[in-house]
Amino acid sequence: MQNIKLGFIGFGNMAQAMVKGLLLKEVLPADQIYACAKNWEKLERTTGSFRVHPCHDAREVAEQADLVIVA
Protein backbone atom coordinates (compact mmCIF):
# COMPACT_ATOMS: atom_id res chain seq x y z
CA MET A 1 0.00 0.00 0.00
CA GLN A 2 3.06 2.26 0.03
CA ASN A 3 2.32 3.89 -3.34
CA ILE A 4 -1.29 4.87 -2.63
CA LYS A 5 -2.18 8.48 -1.90
CA LEU A 6 -4.97 8.58 0.67
CA GLY A 7 -7.43 11.44 1.12
CA PHE A 8 -9.86 12.36 3.88
CA ILE A 9 -12.93 14.51 3.42
CA GLY A 10 -13.41 15.68 6.96
CA PHE A 11 -10.54 15.61 9.44
CA GLY A 12 -12.20 15.23 12.81
CA ASN A 13 -11.55 12.70 15.56
CA MET A 14 -12.25 9.61 13.44
CA ALA A 15 -10.03 10.66 10.52
CA GLN A 16 -7.25 11.73 12.88
CA ALA A 17 -7.41 8.38 14.70
CA MET A 18 -7.12 6.55 11.37
CA VAL A 19 -4.18 8.71 10.29
CA LYS A 20 -2.46 8.23 13.63
CA GLY A 21 -2.77 4.46 13.28
CA LEU A 22 -1.54 4.47 9.68
CA LEU A 23 1.48 6.55 10.62
CA LEU A 24 2.32 4.58 13.78
CA LYS A 25 2.17 1.27 11.89
CA GLU A 26 4.09 2.85 8.99
CA VAL A 27 1.41 1.83 6.50
CA LEU A 28 1.77 5.15 4.65
CA PRO A 29 4.14 8.07 4.96
CA ALA A 30 2.55 11.39 5.97
CA ASP A 31 3.38 13.00 2.64
CA GLN A 32 0.96 10.62 0.89
CA ILE A 33 -2.04 11.70 2.99
CA TYR A 34 -4.37 14.60 2.12
CA ALA A 35 -7.29 16.08 4.07
CA CYS A 36 -9.90 18.81 3.90
CA ALA A 37 -12.34 20.19 6.46
CA LYS A 38 -14.72 23.11 6.89
CA ASN A 39 -12.53 25.03 9.34
CA TRP A 40 -9.28 25.91 7.51
CA GLU A 41 -7.40 27.19 10.58
CA LYS A 42 -8.15 24.06 12.59
CA LEU A 43 -7.30 21.89 9.59
CA GLU A 44 -3.91 23.58 9.25
CA ARG A 45 -3.16 22.91 12.93
CA THR A 46 -4.24 19.29 12.90
CA THR A 47 -2.67 18.37 9.56
CA GLY A 48 0.48 20.16 10.68
CA SER A 49 0.72 18.01 13.79
CA PHE A 50 0.57 14.88 11.60
CA ARG A 51 2.55 16.49 8.74
CA VAL A 52 -0.10 15.55 6.18
CA HIS A 53 -1.25 17.80 3.33
CA PRO A 54 -4.16 20.19 4.01
CA CYS A 55 -6.50 20.76 1.05
CA HIS A 56 -8.98 23.59 0.56
CA ASP A 57 -11.91 21.40 -0.50
CA ALA A 58 -13.10 17.91 -1.40
CA ARG A 59 -12.32 18.45 -5.06
CA GLU A 60 -8.65 19.09 -4.27
CA VAL A 61 -8.53 15.95 -2.10
CA ALA A 62 -10.07 13.91 -4.93
CA GLU A 63 -7.58 15.30 -7.44
CA GLN A 64 -4.59 14.43 -5.23
CA ALA A 65 -5.62 11.10 -3.73
CA ASP A 66 -6.04 7.63 -5.22
CA LEU A 67 -8.44 6.60 -2.45
CA VAL A 68 -10.78 8.96 -0.58
CA ILE A 69 -12.41 8.31 2.79
CA VAL A 70 -15.37 10.41 3.89
CA ALA A 71 -14.98 10.75 7.63
Give the location of each predicted region:
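NAD(P)+-binding Rossmann beta1-loop-alpha1 motif at the extreme N-terminus of oxidoreductases
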Residues: 1-64
